[in-house]
């Protein structure tokens, strides 16, 4: 080929440049497998992250898919082959299970991001109907005869496990750490649960849309979202005297992301949750931000609560899971009426 001909040289150069640009452009697809009530948060966050990534790599095409359900159920789906690049679940035990049973990420995954890989927090509060007709003020009111309590199944829902442990922690504090009395209290509470929903969003739908129950035990973000969406004073938030600090964690599913070629983008996606923009998105979707400046800005949006922690009351999620939610554990004993 005679490249001394300027027009021919430019034509060849154009082909080379076009090929190089085409090679550089990537069609990226991420799957975020998340727990039940994070739909709105991640729809909002995904839009911001796509814009952020396009600013760095303008030729890339990025599509983020979401999967939602009860946290325990979602973890099992990933272990069984759902090819998540990222998991954003309700509690650390569920990601531990993916690491231990699925061998899809390292056991020390929590050390890879700040705050034990938990970019935002939440807690457990109550939602009651307008005027609070049953006079619900604290956990004790949930075990009274004739009070229908809506909470999902702890076997499938991460939020339900937080609900259960918050109630247990309250009973321990009230009764001088008497485990037998705590078990009796939680058993009474679950006797007042008329519907066995598998996830937090299903429980909210049962209470808010189907009109079943006198009180919903729920994630704080789910309650605040329900208040916003109803907009007419149809419901009220009740903050109990004691609740629990819920720390939903996030992780890259290494083996899947490596196979998909999405490791760098998946890592950047989770890191973006910790930026001021990511924290602001969490706050406006009613999750408590970790970043102090953003938390201070939104402090008025969240009730002040006395919060227990999973470590101080239950010595971490591994022990809580085995004692309370494993097959034959305390929750199963409560359900069957055994000791």
Spell out what each predicted region is.
Residues 26-157, 306, 334-335:
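N-terminal segment of the mature folded domain
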Residues 46-55, 79-83, 92, 99-103, ...:
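Sec-exported extracytoplasmic/periplasmic mature domains
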Residues 131-137, 156, 169-177, 256-264:
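Short helix-loop capping/hinge motifs at secondary-structure junctions, enriched
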Residues 257-339:
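Extracellular/periplasmic juxtamembrane helices and adjacent flexible linkers that interface
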Residues 33-35, 128-130, 148-175, 190-193, ...:
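Short beta-strand->loop
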Residues 174-241:
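Ligand-binding pocket segment of bilobal, Venus flytrap-like solute-binding proteins
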Residues 1-11:
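Bacterial N-terminal signal peptides that target proteins for export
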Residues 10-22:
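Bacterial N-terminal signal peptides
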